[in-house]
Structure formats: structure tokens, C-alpha cells
């Protein structure tokens, strides 16, 4: 591993693995079939984004991840680099057409003028789409 540690995966808790999985597949992820862990009873799905995996874990029967039980802060946003302004525009349009909320339509932001859009996934997690 050169250059230090690399992010291997990020886990998101959800009440709807199937709905959240469909949203991230629309962003280009390759999804495993959702399955249920025999030991914990938690339903989960792994989404592959090239070198980083996004694990979706469905909360069932009042189960809460340890981070929530401890009152720890959560995720601020997930960021996805799409490669072009046209890709940001197209995906933002597709996300809106699918009924998901667009917080900020595509625009140039910040002093560097980075082209981005900010949307919400079905669970309300903030997702930033950039070039």
C-alpha cells in the first residue's frame, strides 16, 4: 500500500436496503444481491465503486449500529467524481426524474469554481456529484 492507508469501505445504516441499493446503482455502483447475516440477522448489500465498497446495512427490529447507540456524529456527505460536467448534469436530471430530491442543481461552487450538484439519497444522506 503506497501513500498510506486507503479507504476500503464505508457503511450506511438504512431502513430500506433495496431502495438505497437502487439509488447507488443509478450512480454507477455494481451491487451484490442483498443477503441476511445468519449471526446478526441484519440484512445487507455491498456496492462496489471501483476501489471503495459501500456497505448498506438494514436496521431491523429496533436494532441500531453501535455508533448511533453511543450518540457519535454521523456522515456529512458522500462525494462522487463523475468525470465531466455533462455527466453531472445527466445524472442529476436522472435522479430528479426518479423522484429524489436535488438540494443544489449543477453549478460552479467555491473559489475554485468546482462544478457540482448536491442531492439526497432515499434515506436523506447528502450526496455530492462533481466533475
For each feature predicted by the language model, list its residue ranges.
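Short amphipathic alpha-helices within nucleic acid-binding modules
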Residues: 86-91
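N-terminal beta-strand motif that seeds the catalytic metal site of vicinal oxygen chelate
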Residues: 1-21, 33, 75-80
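Short beta-strand/turn micro-motifs at beta-sheet edges
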Residues: 62-68
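A generic structural micro-feature
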Residues: 2, 39, 69-72
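Exposed loop/turn and edge beta-strand positions of beta-sandwich/beta-sheet ligand-binding modules
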Residues: 6, 41-43, 74, 113
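Vicinal oxygen chelate
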Residues: 1-3, 45-46, 92-131
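Core segments of cupin and vicinal oxygen chelate
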Residues: 13-54, 60
Amino acid at each position: 500500500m503506497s501513500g498510506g492507508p486507503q479507504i476500503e469501505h464505508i457503511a450506511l445504516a438504512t431502513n430500506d436496503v433495496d431502495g438505497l441499493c437502487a439509488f447507488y446503482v443509478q450512480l454507477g455502483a455494481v451491487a451484490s444481491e442483498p443477503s441476511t447475516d445468519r449471526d446478526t440477522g441484519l440484512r445487507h448489500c455491498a456496492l462496489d465503486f471501483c476501489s471503495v465498497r459501500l456497505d448498506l446495512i438494514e436496521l431491523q427490529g429496533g436494532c441500531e449500529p453501535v455508533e448511533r447507540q453511543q450518540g457519535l456524529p454521523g456522515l456529512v456527505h458522500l462525494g462522487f467524481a463523475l468525470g465531466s460536467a455533462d455527466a453531472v448534469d445527466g445524472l442529476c436530471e436522472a435522479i430528479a426524474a426518479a423522484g429524489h430530491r436535488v438540494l443544489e442543481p449543477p453549478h460552479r461552487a467555491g473559489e475554485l469554481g468546482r462544478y457540482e450538484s448536491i442531492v439526497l439519497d432515499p434515506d436523506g444522506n447528502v450526496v455530492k456529484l462533481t466533475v
